[in-house]
Amino acid sequence: ADVQSLYEMGVTGSVSRSRITRLLPRGVRYQGVVHEQPASDLPRVLVPLVIRHDGYLPEQMSRKQGRNQRLLLQELSRNPRDAYINYQLGVDFELNRDFSKACAHYGVAMEQLEVSSGYEHDLCVRYLYCLGQAGRHEEGLALAQAQMPKWQDSPDFFFTLGGVLLDAAIAKLDGQVEHWLSMAQASWERCLEIGEVDACQHGGVAGRGSYLAAHNLAVMHEQLGNLDEAQALRLRHPMPASAS
């Protein structure tokens, strides 16, 4: 199914889309304590089913504060190197803005990840984002360099990389402010080149291949005094009413 999770990002809304198995044949059961997965080796088939999920909105998060984390930590005590449990713990810490702990669990998940895991793309993008938010720019850039060949068609990857590069410029990493700014610009331009992709390809956040990347580029051009280019970007990739 196409699961569309709703988030709040500052004053705007965001929709993350994921391909998740939620329509099960008779006899198949879920396993796991949180974010359960079907216990089956049967092939997955995409069906035209869209599920809207509001569990990550603030009012829902406040109701279940700490619940998922307690359950996941109990499971982690039994399987400390399990990639999926560490991934889900990373997500929980990230949503609660504890980026240092999120990075610790994402790092273990990356080390233990099995080939062709369905959440590999999301894990990579989230880990990259959290490294940037934790101020670990050099580690983030090293991760991006290692992972880039896999995600050449992912606007989410390049959108997030652009944010890390901008943070590196703000932090004056290695004294190369202009270098990091130009690379951030190139990353967001790459998002527009790729465009929006089908959620079934990797999953990801709507707008990172269009209006969100264009917004970041427009802000950058405005700061540089390139007002005509900024306006052109906003006109070519208008922000939808639902995200403004």
Segments the model singles out, each with a brief description of its role:
Residues 84, 118-122, 155-156, 205-207, ...:
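Start-of-helix register in tetratricopeptide repeats
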Residues 93, 127, 131, 165-168, ...:
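Residue at a conserved register position within TPR or TPR-like alpha-solenoid repeats
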Residues 1-104:
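Catalytic-site signature of metal-activated, phosphate-bearing donor transferases
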Residues 65, 99-100, 137, 171-174, ...:
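TPR-repeat structural position
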